[in-house]
From Swiss-Prot:
GO terms for biological process: defense response to bacterium; killing of cells of another organism. The linear precursor LarA is probably cleaved by the putative peptidase LarD, generating linear 18-residue Lariatin-A or 20-residue Lariatin-B. These linear peptides are probably cross-linked by LarB. Finally, lariatins A and B may be exported by ABC transporter LarE. The keyword Electron transport does not apply. The gene is larA. It comes from Rhodococcus jostii. Is composed of a ring composed by 8 residues, and a tail of 10 or 12 residues. The peptide is threaded when the C-terminal tail is inserted throught the isopeptide-bonded ring. The record marks 43-44 as: Important in resistance to hydrolysis. Keywords: Antibiotic, Antimicrobial, Bacteriocin, Isopeptide bond. There is a cross-link at residues 27-34 (Isoglutamyl glycine isopeptide (Gly-Glu)). This is Lariatin. Residues 1-26 form a propeptide. It comes from the Bacteria.
């Protein structure tokens, strides 16, 4: 019951780090694709 939200909690920091990395990296498309695939709920706008 509490393990479900736990998954999102440990995934949240990972997504933030990935997004920041993609923004600074030239191959952001690769990281962005992987990042989006990992989290279908969070979708950054254009």
């Amino acid at each position: 019951m509490t393990s479900q939200p736990s998954k999102k909690t440990y995934n949240a920091p990972s997504l933030v780090q990935r997004g920041k990395f993609a923004r600074t990296t030239a191959g952001s498309q690769l990281v962005y694709r992987e990042w989006v695939g990992h989290s279908n709920v969070i979708k950054p706008g254009p």
